[in-house]
Amino acid sequence: MNTAIITGASAGIGTSAASLFSQRNFKVINLSRRPCKVEGVLNLCGDLASEENLENILPRLNEAISQSDSVSLVHNAAKMRKDSVLDCSESELREMLEINVVAISALNRRLLPQMPRGSSVIYIGSTLSMKAVPNSFSYILSKHAQVGIMRATCQDLMGKGIHTALINPGFTDTEMLQKHLNNDTELIKSLAKMNSFERLADPSEIAECVLWAHHNPVINGTIIEANLGQKES
């Protein structure tokens, strides 16, 4: 049996990944506040930033891992907000880092020692993992941090038979993007034109990248840009 443990599988890329892994006969476990609606997914709902929650669900995760030939741990859950280096408060920054950085490390520390050879750790980054735009300070900071986490994961797991990669989606048609842009149809259309195909990526396309990355350890330690060929200014 193969298992996919996906954070934030309740919407967007996470839901698409849950659906695809399920179709490929993986046991799929969703870790998020809200349940994933894909049939057959085991939902362990709670706050990823809560150490108490992680300790409560750990026995069930370890049980699933112990029964698996391989595990794909997909760090997809993320928080996004509008702020800048001029106005982001310390409490707001800590809140962002708890989900986008600390929760990742907390899960890795608990699960990686149990995962068998042939497993993978896949991080869902962002175009903003590698560049910056105005008014997304804390999100950009956290996504840059994920690059470092992935690269450190690669080095720390040398010889363990577990590979890692970071996938950077471009603008993708998700609930989080719609909310971040206040459902501004014209703005969304303008963003869609910022790549060579002049459309938003579909979450299912990113999910295909995740599954492919799990099955191909040759990409260990790499960053995969999944942005339809972004136009550079």
Model region roles, listed by residue range:
Residues 108, 142-143, 150:
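Active-site helix of classical SDR
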Residues 199-226:
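C-terminal substrate-recognition "lid" of short-chain dehydrogenase/reductases
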Residues 10, 18:
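N-terminal Rossmann NAD(P)H-binding glycine-rich loop of SDR-like oxidoreductase domains
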